Amino acid sequence: MLNSPDLILSTSLIPESDFAFSDAERQALRVLAEQAAELAARPIEIEKRALWTRHNALKPTRPVIFCDPENSWNEIIPPEALACQNPIARAWEFHLRKQVFWGAEMGDDYSVLPYFPVE
């Protein structure tokens, strides 16, 4: 029952889309991806990834700080701030905007990753 394809498809977080992104959507995603990549390449982000690796391996580290706005992301990045209209482009834009905000504003030990997870 729990592995029923109908259940899996009906509860999927992946929005339906034809992947027909407009030129403006592609450009908006490219700009955000470039910003996220620049943040991820900073030496501090590399240090944070090493810190988390040591911490998760149960090696002595300083306490790590992780600030996740969780349900407040829609206040930090309101829907009207998103440029993309295509559902998948919009989800990717939201993800990238979160990464840029986290890397530029948050000041915690979360590390902006140098890759884009497509799930």
Question: What are the roles of these predicted feature ranges?
Answer:
Residues 1-119:
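N-terminal basic, low-complexity leaders that serve as flexible interaction/assembly modules and, when applicable
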